[in-house]
Regions:
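Single conserved hydrophobic/aromatic residue that forms the stacking wall/gate
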Residues: 1-8, 12-13
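Short, flexible loop segments at boundaries between secondary-structure elements
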Residues: 104-110, 150-186
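Conserved beta-alpha
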Residues: 39-118, 122
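Conserved acidic residues
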Residues: 29, 73, 100, 125, ...
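Proline-aspartate-enriched helix->loop->beta-strand connector
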Residues: 119, 123-133, 149
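A short, gly/pro- and small-residue-rich
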Residues: 23-27, 137-157
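Short glycine-rich anion-binding loops that position phosphate/pyrophosphate groups of nucleotides
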Residues: 9-10, 131-136, 158
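Active-site cofactor/substrate anionic-group-binding motifs, chiefly glycine-
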Residues: 20-41, 48
């Protein structure tokens, strides 16, 4: 089952046109706001969220729990080599965790079935899928029955952040809901 969905402004705009994405988001066990635009829209509509939950922070906290609980984690997505680097850097910072496996986000249908089998056979408890919106959400949804009970979440470009390929905004910008401006500056 898709355990959680991190929803930002881009995803909300896309799901108005993409009915499959809208369906997936409406059937996640947990949907959390990832972006100042979502918080602002909630305020305007009278729905106040306690806080923004940045994908990078959320994934890091889930991984810390996985370290403590010894949950096997599978990293799926990113460019070749990115997931491995993200795993290495996280391990250097927080200690080793059970790795169910990893695969980049580039694969064909034959490889796809091998990946699903690897996720299952590795005893995966946490599946981080970083293939970008809406591909990651749809992929997780389309494979949820095959994958069985696993905390699966789309994490977008989080592997690049974890690997050190993409810097996050300074903390003061994040605290003032300006991370979007920093990302726009870095990736116009």
């Amino acid at each position: 089952e898709i355990g959680s969905g991190l929803v930002g402004s881009e995803m909300c705009i896309r799901d108005r046109e993409d009915k499959e994405l809208a369906y997936v988001l409406n059937h996640c066990s947990l949907v959390v706001p990832d972006g100042a635009g979502i918080l602002w829209a909630g305020e305007q509509l009278g729905t106040y969220f306690p806080a923004r939950v940045a994908g990078a922070d959320y994934a890091e906290e889930i991984l810390k729990i996985a370290v403590k609980e010894k949950w096997p984690v599978y990293f799926l997505g990113g460019a070749p080599g990115v997931a491995e680097t993200a795993i290495r850097r996280f391990t250097e910072r927080y200690g080793p965790f059970e790795k169910a496996g990893f695969h980049d986000g580039y694969f064909d249908e034959m490889e796809e079935q091998k990946i699903v089998e690897e996720i299952k056979s590795g005893g995966t408890k946490v599946l981080l899928c970083g293939m970008g919106v809406p591909k990651q959400e749809k992929w997780l949804w389309n494979h949820k029955k095959e994958l069985g009970p696993v905390l699966a979440m789309g994490v977008g470009g989080v592997f690049d952040v974890m690997a050190g390929n993409l810097r996050r905004a300074p903390l003061w910008m994040r605290n003032h809901r300006l991370e979007w401006a920093y990302r726009l500056y870095l990736q116009p």
